[in-house]
Structures are given as structure tokens and as C-alpha cells.
Amino acid sequence: MQTSPSSTAPCADKALDDLLKEVDRRRNFAIISHPDAGKTTLTEKLLLYGGAIQEAGAVKARRSQRSATSDWMAMEQQRGISITSTVLQFDYRGKILNLLDTPGHQDFSEDTYRTLAAADNAVMLIDAAKGLETQTRKLFEVCRLRHLPIFTFINKLDRPSLTPLELMDEIEQELGMNTYAVNYPIGTGDRFRGVYNRLTKTIHLFERTGTHGSKKAADQTMALDDPALESLLGSDVYAEFQDELELIEEAGAEFDLAAVHGGEMTPVFFGSAMNNFGVELFLQAFLQYAAKPEAHDSNRGTIEPTYEEFSGFVFKLQANMDPKHRDRIAFLRVCSGKFEKDMVVKHPRTGKTVRLSRPQKLFAQERESVDIAYAGDVIGLNNPGAFTIGDTVHTGEKIIYPPIPSFSPELFAYLRSTDPSQYKNFKKGVSELQEEGAVQILQSLDESKRDPILAAVGQLQFEVVQYRLQEEYGVETRLEPLGFSLARWVVEGWDALEKAGRLFNTVVVKDRWDAPVLLFKNQWNLEQVAGDCLDLKLSAIAIPPSL
């Protein structure tokens, strides 16, 4: 692999020094979790401790004063779930953190997949009562593909739960990575009193304030050998804590930051996001151990974040974030150099130059103009059809970053307009929603069937498409479900396609790039086809064509 082209374009000393300092300040991460693990609550509490909000939005939302900070779409507010992604930037102790807030509902994981393409770190949030769940496992596999450092926050320790040792063992056995409990809990459920920081050798006892977590939690810090500790905890809790601590100190792995950054070890933190227990300690440790903005592979080799020429890629599109203006925003991850307002960049996919004249920082529904940004930052670009997901923009010599893959959907249905006179609006709406990545669109190989096939990872995704077509394009639609549950893209073995389509109740369709896709009724059908058509190589991931 080539080295970074930075040596061919030397910076002035001060400019390079400033660039190095700004990149060093950035930390970028996404939270992955199963629904109801507490992602929105943890997000808000991180913002609370980061000083971005003064009171936790979830608490105020329950009082019907406003919605949670990170939710904005009308349907989200009606349903009480996160459907879209946004970016939340805040300063903490001299660092700039970019939290790539992602949908928490299981029906919107593909948007999360794309967001993980822009993340340098992942925070895996686990419900202490439930352990690892389906959605978390799926998202973990995407993190593993990208070798992302994963920090684990085990939530809801103030409720009945599995034991800390059971939870860590499950992570090790099912995900195949070592764990290191940085903050080990003292008691669980109604006996949850605090945590012991194994790296700083300090005890942190939490005080219940009665504010339901809307304000920062107070804690009492003391040494592990403080003679007052046993009386404060009670003899039973103290003895149980000492026994478990002795066990993990003797049998557990040593903390290895290189293994963390390689995705081979996950630092584990315990707490209660609702009551703010352990949140600030987690944030402090994350700041210390998280990976800085990473280098990215490109057509020219590895591009370091400190390369002087600006570059970045679009990982998300979102229309109508402000319904009054029917706008369209492209979310761009800065990969190298310094972004400046009004700069002119090259757009390799179209061969054109584009002036980035109205860049925005996106804090949920709020926006403010951005004058400069650096690697690890995410900015919003007004996008009148100029960009699509995976686009690269850059200054200097041509840079193209790898395209963002699509993942296998699990639900399929024909989408039909109920009013033929609205077909033009219907077609426009479907096209724009596809460009956003709101849903995958497949087409039948039968030219007489012009209606698109929606391919989604959950039923609610269909509902969102229908809702937005009606609200934003004035088109009413109906769905005709198809009885398939798996999709696989054909990598090799084209000659076997006809046979696979004729046998085993399997259908061949095409994606937006006209690549063949096989739809299967179930896993059993997939295994039958794979066993019978040995020359047929299939993939659960689709890589868009390169430029």
C-alpha cells in the first residue's frame, strides 16, 4: 500500500502544527445498542456532562415540554423512537467530541451501518438485565469489519440484572474479544452503590439526588483501603465486591490499549445512565483511551488525517430536516486537511467542482454555520441533488474513498401508488428516498413490473417511507408484501443464476446498479442453493461500483 501523499505536498510549519493540534483534539464515536437499552438516555447524559445541554432532554420530554434532544422528525416525536441519524458535537476538557447519533429502533439499523462508516470508535451499550441482544450482535459485526475500537457501557445496574461476571463472560464467549472492567460495580440492583476504577485505584460512591438524572450526579471518592468503606457499603455488599474484584484481578486480562484500538479488547464500564451513575467516569476514560481520527484507504493509498489537502466523504443524506424549506442535507465526514467555508472542492463522481458555501454544524434540529472543520468532524452541506451516499470531495490531487456498502435487508414488498395520476410524484419521491438511503430499492427482471420493490430491515422502515411519501410528496401508497426474508448479491457464478432462480423457490431481482440479487424465503432455501450451485458465490454485503 502506498504511503500518505503528505510528503509530496508539504505544509508551512505553523499550518501543519495547527492541523496536528486540531486533529489531536478530535474524538469521534457512535453508540450501538439494541432497542430500549438506554441509548437516547446515555446520549443525553453525555451531552449533559459535556455541557452541551443544561438539563437532560428525556426528563423534560416526559413532562411534555419538548422532545429528546436528538429526535426531531414529527414521526419520531409521535412514536417516541429515533428514526433518523444526526450529529452532536460538544467540547469536554479541551477535546472536541463528535457523537454520531444513530437510530435506536431495530428497524433502522442500516442507517446505523452507514453511520459506522464515519465513526472512529463505537460505544456498545448493553442492558444489564438482558445482556447481548440481536441488534447489538449485528452492529458489532459491522464494527468488527472496520476494526473499530469498542467501548462497552453496561447500563441499568440500579435494576435487577445479570452479574457483572456473567455479562463480561458473555461478551468474551459470543463476540470473541477480551474484556477489561475499567469501572467495576459495587453491588447491583437496589444495592448498587458505586464503582471501583481499576486503573486509578479509586472508589466512587454515588449519591441518589432525587432529580431523576436531570442534573449531574454527585459522588464520593475514596481509596480502596479506606477503613470507612465497609461501614459505608454494608458488610454483605463489601464482601461480595472484594471477592469478585479478587477474581477478576487474578483471572482477567491485563489492560492493553493497542488491543483496544485493534478491536481485540473492549474496556467495560458499569453504571446507570438514567441516574447518571458512572456516566462522567466513562466519559473521562473514553476521552483518554479512544482512538484519534484514523487514516483512510483511498485510490492513492492511505490518507492521513494530517494530510494538508482537504478531503471527506458523504455517508448520509437527509431531506426535509426543515419541512418549511424542503431542504436536503448531505452529512460529510472530514478525513484530512482543513475545511473552510466557501472553499471550492473537486467532486470525482461528476468531474465537476463545487463551492461549499453554506456548511452547517448539526445539533439535532438546531443548526449553526461552520467556518472551519478538521478530520473527525461531520458537517452538513446543502445538497440540491449534487451528492449521493459514498461521494468523495477533495482539494489537490484526485482522491476517491471506497464506497459505503449496503447490507442484506430482511423484508420485501412491492410499493404501489394508489392514484395513477400521481405516478410522477411517486417516482420522484421513491428516487429521492432511495438517494437518502431511507430504503433499498430493487426491481423485478420482468420489464412489465415497473413498481419498485422496497427492501428494508424492519416493518417500521416501510411505514416511514409511506408516511414521508404522503407528507412530503402528496402520494398515497399501498404495500404488497413478498414472502422473502434474505437477500444475497451475486459475486461470482453468473451461469448458475438461471438454475438458482428456477429451483428452491428463489427469485432473482436487480439492485439500483443493475447487479443481480437473489431473494430467499429463509435460511434453509439459501443453504440449499449454496449446496446445489457450488460455483455461485454470494455476499450479504453489496459494494457499489467504483468510479
UniProtKB/Swiss-Prot annotation:
UniProt KW keywords: Cytoplasm, GTP-binding, Nucleotide-binding, Protein biosynthesis
Any one GO CC term of the record: cytosol
Residues given in the record as GTP binding sites: 33-40, 101-105, 155-158
Signal peptide positions (record): none
UniProt cross-references to CDD domains, sorted A to Z: RF3 (cd04169), RF3_II (cd03689)
Matching InterPro entries: EF-G-like_DII (IPR053905), EFG_III/V (IPR035647), G_TR_CS (IPR031157), P-loop_NTPase (IPR027417), PrfC (IPR004548), RF3_C (IPR032090), RF3_dom_3_sf (IPR038467), RF3_GTP-bd (IPR041732)
GO biological process terms, semicolon-separated: regulation of translational termination; translational termination
Record's keyword annotation contains Isomerase: no
Single annotated GO MF: GTPase activity
Domain of life the protein comes from: Bacteria
Subcellular location: Cytoplasm
tr-type G domain residues: 24-294
Keyword Cytoplasm among UniProt keywords: yes
PANTHER family associated with the record: PEPTIDE CHAIN RELEASE FACTOR RF3
Sequence similarity: Belongs to the TRAFAC class translation factor GTPase superfamily. Classic translation factor GTPase family. PrfC subfamily.
Known role: Increases the formation of ribosomal termination complexes and stimulates activities of RF-1 and RF-2. It binds guanine nucleotides and has strong preference for UGA stop codons. It may interact directly with the ribosome. The stimulation of RF-1 and RF-2 is significantly reduced by GTP and GDP, but not by GMP.
Protein name from the UniProt record: Peptide chain release factor 3
Organism: Synechocystis sp. (strain ATCC 27184 / PCC 6803 / Kazusa)
Gene: prfC
